């Protein structure tokens, strides 16, 4: 997509880039999006995610459409390059983008429409896709050890400069030794679980440059308001936790305390909000 807009925070208009195309040259259209949604939300696919349940026409409890459904009111094609997503309840743009749009995967309709509905996830294409929309294609993988990629030379934004990538699946105890030996070239806390006790040792490696960027993930506490309806109790939990100490001691100062879902690096960050301070007595 090259733009997402909304006027009421329920109807989100997604415009697909005019140049976007699959690796076989077929244009990516709104039909790909709507058809992919139907297939992924099918009860025969039994997708483990429940994110589809927030959209109109999808069961809120299961996240599925009816078996054999040919359309869903919550995801419709406006024109060849425009799709409208309609949610059951209003949500902010950042919630739609980061919690839903980011996890919806569009597939090539002209490929998957030839695969039986209940056989999608076990099909050869699904597990070894040779028609893709991104810069890389999977060439090989071992679920417990690695996944290998080759550049998509027909990528509509231009072929990647790195021809091949091999993503190793490591146990956290292997990260330090793999960096030390040069077995892996790069990693991050978002790619693998780097033990806190290894941070100083990794920073000391002569063959490794540690680069800290802006925070991109967060740790939050989610509370069932039906079980704890008193807002004062929920507020007390925030006052009782020394979040700055967690940043200073656990994250070595590489983080920030925020009252919200997005970091200061996000264009949706509201810098007018002052985070609640640690105050055990008030709690």
Spans of features found by a protein language model:
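Short helices/loops that flank or line small-molecule/ion binding pockets
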Residues: 25-27, 32, 173-187, 231-235
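Structural transition elements
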Residues: 257-283
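Ligand-site clamp/hinge motif
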Residues: 152-198, 216
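Ligand-binding "clamshell"
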Residues: 196-211
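Alpha-helical secondary-structure segments
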Residues: 29-36, 82-86, 134-135, 163-164, ...
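Gly/Pro-rich hinge or "lid" segments in bacterial periplasmic/extracellular proteins
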Residues: 86-91, 98-160, 164, 174, ...
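Surface-exposed binding/hinge segments that line
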Residues: 5, 15, 50-114
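Aromatic- and charge-enriched surface segment that lines or borders ligand/interaction sites
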Residues: 2-50, 78, 84, 178
